[in-house]
C-alpha cells in the first residue's frame, strides 16, 4: 500500500510508541510480553499454583481476565455507582483449577482489584503497561474468533451470515486502542457503525448536546478507521460520504452493508498478530528468557519459536477430542480463524479441519459444568513451518480489484490463488438500489465483476523452515485449489453470546 510510510507498524501501536527503528520495536514489544510473563509468575505464586496448574490454559485465562477487569476503569466506575447485590465492585476473580487426589477441582478465588493492579504494575516497572493489557484482549478476541461464529450478531444488524470472514475482532472491547482497531475486520467496523447509527435513529438526543459532539467525533473516527482498511478509491470515497453525512440513517446503513459485501472480493487490509496466553510468556520468563534483551515480534518467527517449546495443558470434557482442542488454540494463537485452511494446514504440518468437524467446545469451562468427569491433556501447539503475518487483504493489481474468496481473510503472507465463487458473491448484490451513491456502487460492482482469477491471487512471501529465522529461503507451497478453504463454511459452531 502506498500510504505505508505514514502508518505506524503494529508493534508501535501495540506498545504505544512513537516512530522507532526495528531494534527498538523488538525491544519494546519484548518488554511488553516480558511484563506479562513476570505478572503471570507472580500471580501463580500468590495463588500457590503448582507448575502444572500454572500451565493450564483455563487458569491462564482466569488470571488474564482478572487483570483486564482490574484495569477496566469505566466498568469499575459503573459498578461503584450501580451496586448490585452480593457483588463487591472492588474485587475481581474467577475459577482456578487445581489438581487434588488425581482429579481437577474448581476453586473460585477473589482478589482486590487494587492488589492485582499493584502486582501488574510491579511486573511492568511500575507502569500501567496498557499495551500489555491490549495484547491480552487481542488474545481473547482471537480465541473467540476461532471458537464462535457471529451469525446471530450479523443477522441482528441486517448483514449476511456469509460475511463471517469479515468479523475478526468482533468481541474486542471498545477500549482496545489503536492496536485493537488494527486487527478489527471490515465487518466488525461496519457492525459497530450500524449499531451507532441505529441508536441515533431511535434516540433523537444521541447526536445532540455535549455528549452528542463526543459521539460524533467517535463516529467519524470509526469511519476513518474503516476507510483506512479499504484498498480501492471507490470504497474509500463511499466511506467519506458515510462519514460526512449530517444525520446518519438508513441510507448510510445500506451503504455500509454494501461496502461490507464488497469487501468479500475487494478485501480490506486487516492486521494479524500472534498473541499467546499469559502462561506461555510466564513459562519462558521463568526459564530465564529475557524478552526485552532478545527482542520479540508478534508478526515474525518469535511466537512460533515460543510455542515450539512450551507445554500448555487444557481441561478436556468427556466427549471432546484433544487434537481438536489443540487446533482451536493453535488457530487462536496465530489469529488464523479466517485464514484458508490449506495454508494453515501446510504451516502447521497437520490437517486443519473446518469448525463444524471439530469435536470440541470453547476453552473456558462454565461454572455449572461437572468437574468430576474432566480430564486434561497437553495442547499440541507446534508448527512445521512459520510465515510472516500479513496486514494486507490481497494485492491490488494496478489499483484493480484485489479479490479473494467469500470466506477467507489471509493471516499469513503466503502466495496462493484465492478461489472464489463470483456468482455466489455477486448474488449478494442483486436488487438493492437503496443508498444514494450509485456511481461509486457501479464502479465497485464493475471492479468486482472484472476481478480475474490472476488478479485474485495473494502474492506473499511463502513459508519458512523454523531454522530460517531471517526468512531467507521462502518455500512457496502449491495448494490443491479445488477444495473450499474456509473454516466456518457450512458450519454449526456455537454462537458467541456477549
Swiss-Prot record:
Family: Belongs to the influenza viruses nucleoprotein family.
Motif placement: Unconventional nuclear localization signal: 1-18
PTM comment, free text: Late in virus-infected cells, may be cleaved from a 56-kDa protein to a 53-kDa protein by a cellular caspase. This cleavage might be a marker for the onset of apoptosis in infected cells or have a specific function in virus host interaction.
Organism superkingdom: Viruses
Keywords associated with the record: Capsid protein, Helical capsid protein, Host nucleus, Host-virus interaction, Ribonucleoprotein, RNA-binding, Viral nucleoprotein, Viral penetration into host nucleus, Virion, Virus entry into host cell
One GO term (biological process): viral penetration into host nucleus
Function: Encapsidates the negative strand viral RNA, protecting it from nucleases. The encapsidated genomic RNA is termed the ribonucleoprotein (RNP) and serves as template for transcription and replication. The RNP needs to be localized in the host nucleus to start an infectious cycle, but is too large to diffuse through the nuclear pore complex. NP comprises at least 2 nuclear localization signals that are responsible for the active RNP import into the nucleus through cellular importin alpha/beta pathway.
Lineage: Viruses, Riboviria, Orthornavirae, Negarnaviricota, Polyploviricotina
Intracellular or extracellular location(s): Virion; Host nucleus
Short motif (Bipartite nuclear localization signal): ranges: 198-216
Entry GO MF terms: RNA binding; structural molecule activity
Subunit structure: Homomultimerizes to form the nucleocapsid. May bind host exportin-1/XPO1. Binds to viral genomic RNA. Protein-RNA contacts are mediated by a combination of electrostatic interactions between positively charged residues and the phosphate backbone and planar interactions between aromatic side chains and bases.
Official protein name in the record: Nucleoprotein
A GO-annotated cellular component: helical viral capsid
Bilayer-spanning residue ranges: none
Region feature (Disordered): 1-21
Pfam families membership: Flu_NP (PF00506)
Amino acid at each position: 500500500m502506498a500510504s505505508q510510510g505514514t502508518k505506524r507498524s503494529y508493534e508501535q501501536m501495540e506498545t504505544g510508541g512513537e516512530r522507532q527503528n526495528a531494534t527498538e520495536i523488538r525491544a519494546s514489544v519484548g518488554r511488553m510480553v516480558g511484563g506479562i510473563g513476570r505478572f503471570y509468575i507472580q500471580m501463580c505464586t500468590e495463588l500457590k499454583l503448582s507448575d502444572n496448574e500454572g500451565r493450564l490454559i483455563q487458569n491462564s485465562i482466569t488470571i488474564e481476565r482478572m487483570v483486564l477487569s482490574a484495569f477496566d476503569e469505566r466498568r469499575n466506575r459503573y459498578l461503584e455507582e450501580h451496586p448490585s447485590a452480593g457483588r463487591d465492585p472492588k474485587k475481581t476473580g474467577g475459577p482456578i483449577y487445581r489438581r487434588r487426589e488425581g482429579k481437577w477441582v474448581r476453586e473460585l478465588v477473589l482478589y482486590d482489584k487494587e492488589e492485582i493492579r499493584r502486582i501488574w504494575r510491579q511486573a511492568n516497572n511500575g507502569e500501567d503497561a496498557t499495551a500489555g493489557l491490549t495484547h491480552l484482549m487481542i488474545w481473547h478476541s482471537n480465541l473467540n474468533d476461532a471458537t464462535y461464529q457471529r451469525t446471530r450478531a450479523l443477522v441482528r444488524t441486517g448483514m449476511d451470515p456469509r460475511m463471517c470472514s469479515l468479523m475478526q475482532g468482533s468481541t474486542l472491547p471498545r477500549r482496545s486502542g489503536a492496536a485493537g482497531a488494527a486487527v478489527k475486520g471490515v465487518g466488525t467496523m461496519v457492525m459497530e457503525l450500524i449499531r451507532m447509527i441505529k441508536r441515533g435513529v431511535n434516540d433523537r438526543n444521541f447526536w445532540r448536546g455535549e455528549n452528542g459532539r463526543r459521539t460524533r467525533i467517535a463516529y467519524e473516527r470509526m469511519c476513518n478507521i474503516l476507510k483506512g482498511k479499504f484498498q480501492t478509491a471507490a470504497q474509500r470515497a463511499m466511506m467519506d460520504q458515510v462519514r460526512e453525512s449530517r444525520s446518519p440513517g438508513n441510507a448510510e446503513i445500506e451503504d455500509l452493508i454494501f461496502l461490507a459485501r464488497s469487501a468479500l472480493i475487494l478485501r480490506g487490509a486487516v492486521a494479524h498478530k500472534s498473541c499467546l496466553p499469559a502462561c506461555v510468556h510466564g513459562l519462558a520468563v521463568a526459564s530465564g528468557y529475557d524478552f526485552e534483551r532478545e527482542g520479540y515480534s508478534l508478526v515474525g518467527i518469535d511466537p512460533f519459536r515460543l510455542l515450539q517449546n512450551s507445554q500448555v495443558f487444557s481441561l478436556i470434557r468427556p466427549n471432546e477430542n484433544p487434537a481438536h482442542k489443540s487446533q482451536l488454540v493453535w488457530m487462536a494463537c496465530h489469529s488464523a480463524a479466517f485464514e484458508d485452511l490449506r495454508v494453515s494446514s501446510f504451516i502447521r504440518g497437520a490437517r486443519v479441519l473446518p469448525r463444524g468437524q471439530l469435536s470440541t467446545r470453547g476453552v473456558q469451562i462454565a461454572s455449572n459444568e461437572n468437574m468430576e468427569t474432566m480430564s486434561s491433556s497437553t495442547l499440541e501447539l507446534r508448527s512445521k513451518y512459520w510465515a510472516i503475518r500479513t496486514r494486507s487483504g490481497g494485492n491490488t493489481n494496478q489499483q484493480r480489484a484485489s479479490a479473494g474468496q467469500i470466506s477467507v481473510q489471509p493471516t499469513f503472507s503466503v502466495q496462493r490463488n484465492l478461489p472464489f465463487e463470483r456468482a455466489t458473491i455477486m448474488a449478494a448484490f442483486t436488487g438493492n438500489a437503496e443508498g444514494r451513491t450509485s456511481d461509486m456502487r457501479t464502479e465497485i460492482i464493475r471492479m468486482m465483476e472484472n476481478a480475474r482469477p490472476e488478479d485474485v491471487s495473494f502474492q506473499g512471501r511463502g513459508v519458512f523452515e523454523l531454522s530460517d529465522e531471517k526468512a531467507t529461503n521462502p518455500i512457496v507451497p502449491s495448494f490443491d485449489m479445488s477444495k473450499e478453504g474456509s473454516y466456518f463454511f457450512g458450519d454449526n459452531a456455537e454462537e458467541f453470546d456477549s
